[in-house]
């Protein structure tokens, strides 16, 4: 089931790239914009799910240790406070999207934020570390 879901995003990327190429050759600007939007959606779905699959573990997880644990304590005050903020980000999404813990490479700190839909709307300089799929199918 999951591999079919993810494969649909990859197929969507390939289709959008082919249609985008054709639209550019024809100079069809409306089709260019439509296929750029479709490409962003499907590429976002592929990237988001690629991160998501790596976040999952058959044995569940536990609190982080090492540098990540220290950064969470420093940025959020404690793991429990981080967990509360991350849960609020996930539950506060209106519609479909993702809750994300990311490392801000410019500010050099951890942030939680929401992604709406799939369009890979990760702020510049952010490296996603943890994502939770909050789409209705999840």
Curated annotation (Swiss-Prot):
Alphabetically ordered keywords of this record: Manganese, Metal-binding, Oxidoreductase
Binding residue positions for Mn(2+): 1, 49, 133, 137
The UniProt record lists the keyword Metal-binding: yes
One Pfam family from the record: Sod_Fe_N
Catalytic activity: 2 superoxide + 2 H(+) = H2O2 + O2
GO molecular function: metal ion binding; superoxide dismutase activity
Primary role: Destroys superoxide anion radicals which are normally produced within the cells and which are toxic to biological systems.
Family the entry assigns: Belongs to the iron/manganese superoxide dismutase family.
Protein name stated in the entry: Superoxide dismutase [Mn]
Organism in which the protein naturally occurs: Mycobacteroides chelonae (Mycobacterium chelonae)
């Amino acid at each position: 089931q999951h591999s079919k879901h993810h494969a649909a995003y990859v197929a969507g990327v390939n289709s959008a790239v082919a249609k985008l190429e054709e639209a550019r050759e024809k100079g069809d600007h409306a089709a260019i914009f439509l296929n750029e939007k479709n490409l962003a959606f499907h590429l976002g779905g592929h990237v988001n799910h690629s991160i998501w699959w790596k976040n999952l573990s058959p044995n569940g997880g536990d609190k982080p240790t090492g540098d990540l644990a220290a950064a969470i304590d420093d940025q959020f005050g404690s793991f429990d406070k981080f967990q509360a903020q991350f849960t609020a980000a996930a539950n506060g999404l209106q519609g479909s999207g993702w809750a994300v813990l990311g490392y801000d490479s410019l500010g050099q700190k951890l942030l939680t934020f929401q992604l709406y839909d799939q369009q890979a709307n990760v702020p510049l300089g952010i490296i996603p570390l943890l994502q939770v799929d909050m789409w209705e199918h999840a």
